[in-house]
Amino acid sequence: MWVCSTLWRVRTPARQWRGLLPASGCHGPAASSYSASAEPARVRALVYGHHGDPAKVVELKNLELAAVRGSDVRVKMLAAPINPSDINMIQGNYGFLPELPAVGGNEGVAQVVAVGSNVTGLKPGDWVIPANAGLGTWRTEAVFSEEALIQVPSDIPLQSAATLGVNPCTAYRMLMDFEQLQPGDSVIQNASNSGVGQAVIQIAAALGLRTINVVRDRPDIQKLSDRLKSLGAEHVITEEELRRPEMKNFFKDMPQPRLALNCVGGKSSTELLRQLARGGTMVTYGGMAKQPVVASVSLLIFKDLKLRGFWLSQWKKDHSPDQFKELILTLCDLIRRGQLTAPACSQVPLQDYQSALEASMKPFISSKQILTM
């Protein structure tokens, strides 16, 4: 299997209300493209004023757009997904929470409409994505600082650009940062049909890694298995199959995994640990089951397993903006080669946000909801 050498080389151990009026920090003279006396532009945004059930607390509102100053960039949002982290943030269950009221959405792609006089790295027509979480992407237009945005090539598919900044980055870093994997090594993961899971399958295949992909049983399990295998998955098994003694037969023809990726917790994480090779690592990046990770004492002692966690926001804090930009460009190269595609998506107009929010929280929904503006 062809292995992209660039992939192996990149191995490195605001508020959301910003840009809308009224808000503290909204400012005076417009950029040269705008008249300071012009009527403020009106934009639509999905706003929540308190934490709770997203389907109940999120509202579509008309808001005024702030003027563009020297270091600002006005953008038109093109598409923005609904991720689990977005839901958790609205519910009030996340690693950081924006000041309220806030605009929802941590990810998406936008097109630059105008720039301030001090902006040097962007121009109208460029595509951009958020540099960090918390920007508030569920809106039609916004004014952000130049440093809050990262340019991405406009020759990649819109859905790929809209879903580039969170899940593929998480997948790539987990594959690269915790074990020194080599082509032919194997990786096991749960929640394999999630956005991160699908990215793991594809990036692992590009790296020459073999994957064991665990999913919950469901009526259309064969259809799901076929789709994941079309992405590059070597094995797709259910949670029930993972618990069977026959699992040991997997490792007659492939090495035991040195890396396990856990997005579920509870019994599922315990079973992942059981499959790891001695000295292997399980990385937890989510907790869909809302149950603690349970690690067998004997596994920790006799197999010397390691338990780690990963949060992309923390990785960004620990690394420079240039390193994140390099990561984005590496993933864009994969997209251009056809080795990384967007997860299965359903595009939903912004005004139909209620149905999109409800669908994103239903079990066994493999299609990511993407809001289009």
Swiss-Prot record:
GO terms for molecular function: enoyl-[acyl-carrier-protein] reductase (NADPH) activity. NADP(+) binds at residues 167, 193-196, 216-218, 285-288, 310-312, 368. GO terms for cellular component: membrane; mitochondrial matrix; mitochondrion; nucleus. Keywords: Acetylation, Cytoplasm, Disease variant, Dystonia, Fatty acid biosynthesis, Fatty acid metabolism, Lipid biosynthesis, Lipid metabolism, Mitochondrion, NADP, Nucleus, Oxidoreductase, Transit peptide. It comes from the Eukaryota. Highly expressed in skeletal and heart muscle. Expressed at lower level in placenta, liver, kidney and pancreas. Weakly or not expressed in lung. CDD domains: ETR. Changing residue 94 to F: Reduces catalytic activity by 95%. Strongly reduces affinity for trans-oct-2-enoyl-CoA. The active site is at residue 94. Changing residue 170 to A: Reduces catalytic activity by 69%. It is an enzyme of class 1 (oxidoreductase). Its EC number is 1.3.1.104. InterPro entries: ADH-like_C (IPR013149), ADH-like_N (IPR013154), GroES-like_sf (IPR011032), Mito_Enoyl-ACP_Reductase (IPR051034), NAD(P)-bd_dom_sf (IPR036291), PKS_ER (IPR020843). Changing residue 129 to M: Strongly increases activity with trans-oct-2-enoyl-CoA. No effect on activity with trans-tetradec-2-enoyl-CoA. Decreases activity with trans-hexadec-2-enoyl-CoA by 20%. Homodimer. Isoform 2 interacts with PPARA in the nucleus and increases its activity. Catalyzes the NADPH-dependent reduction of trans-2-enoyl thioesters in mitochondrial fatty acid synthesis (fatty acid synthesis type II). Fatty acid chain elongation in mitochondria uses acyl carrier protein (ACP) as an acyl group carrier, but the enzyme accepts both ACP and CoA thioesters as substrates in vitro. Displays a preference for medium-chain over short- and long-chain substrates. May provide the octanoyl chain used for lipoic acid biosynthesis, regulating protein lipoylation and mitochondrial respiratory activity particularly in Purkinje cells. It is linked to Dystonia, childhood-onset, with optic atrophy and basal ganglia abnormalities: An autosomal recessive neurologic disorder characterized by childhood-onset dystonia, basal ganglia degeneration and optic atrophy with decreased visual acuity. Dystonia is defined by the presence of sustained involuntary muscle contraction, often leading to abnormal postures. DYTOABG severity is variable, and some patients lose independent ambulation. Optic atrophy 16: A disease characterized by visual impairment in association with optic atrophy. Atrophy of the optic disk indicates a deficiency in the number of nerve fibers which arise in the retina and converge to form the optic disk, optic nerve, optic chiasm and optic tracts. OPA16 is an autosomal recessive form. Patients also show mild sensorineural hearing impairment. This is Enoyl-[acyl-carrier-protein] reductase, mitochondrial. It comes from Homo sapiens.
